[in-house]
Regions:
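Canonical alpha-helical transmembrane segments
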Residues: 13-18, 38-53
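Transmembrane alpha-helix entry/boundary detector in multi-pass membrane proteins
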Residues: 2, 22-41, 68-75
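Mid-membrane cores of alpha-helical transmembrane segments in multi-pass membrane proteins
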Residues: 33-36, 80, 84
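Start-of-domain marker
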Residues: 1-18
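Juxtamembrane "helix-exit" motif on the non-cytosolic side of transmembrane helices
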Residues: 16-22, 93-97
Length: 153
C-alpha cells in the first residue's frame, strides 16, 4: 500500500500544481488526477491500516482462505481497471470528436490512472501468488520418531 499511497500523493501534489498552471485539456487532466488520487490515498490508508492488523493466530486453512479471497479481489480489480482504461479512452475520443477540452483531459487522466492500477493489481497478484506457492508447498507429514509421532506442516 506504500506504492499506492506514494503514487496518490505524488499525483495529488502534481495535479494540484498542474491544475493552476495549465490551460485547455491539461487543466482537466490534472483536475481528474487530483480527484482520482484522493480516493486512491484513502484506499491506501485503509489498506495500510488493515495490513498492520494481521491476525497471527490464523490457522493454515483460514490463512489459505484469506489468500484466495485476496487473489479473487485482485483479479476483479484488474477487470475494473480494464473498464477504467476503456472508459477513459472513450471519453478521450469523445472529447476529440466534440472538441471538449474537459472530456479530453478527463479521458487521458482515466487512461493513465487505470493503466497504473492495472499494473499495480497484476504485480500484486503475481507477488501474492509466488508467496502462496511457498505456502502451498508445505505439506502435512506424520512421522514416527521412536517415542511417538511427529506431525509437521
Amino acid at each position: 500500500m506504500i506504492v499506492l499511497g506514494s503514487w496518490a500523493t505524488s499525483n495529488i501534489i502534481s495535479g494540484t500544481i498542474g491544475y493552476y498552471r495549465s490551460d485547455n485539456s491539461s487543466k482537466y487532466f490534472h483536475q481528474m488526477n487530483t480527484a482520482w488520487n484522493l480516493v486512491n490515498l484513502g484506499i491506501a490508508g485503509f489498506g495500510y491500516n488493515g495490513a498492520s492488523e494481521i491476525d497471527l493466530s490464523l490457522g493454515y486453512e483460514a490463512a489459505l482462505d484469506k489468500m484466495q479471497s485476496f487473489d479473487k479481489l485482485l483479479l476483479i480489480n484488474s477487470g475494473l481497471d480494464l473498464l477504467y482504461i476503456g472508459s477513459g479512452a472513450w471519453l478521450w475520443d469523445q472529447g476529440i470528436d466534440t472538441s471538449s477540452e474537459r472530456l479530453t483531459g478527463y479521458g487521458k487522466s482515466i487512461v493513465l490512472q487505470g493503466s497504473f492500477l492495472l499494473l499495480f493489481d497484476i504485480s500484486l497478484y503475481l507477488i501474492h501468488r509466488r508467496h502462496a506457492k511457498n505456502l502451498g508447498e508445505r505439506s502435512t507429514q506424520l512421522t514416527f520418531t521412536g517415542n511417538g509421532f511427529l506431525l509437521s506442516f
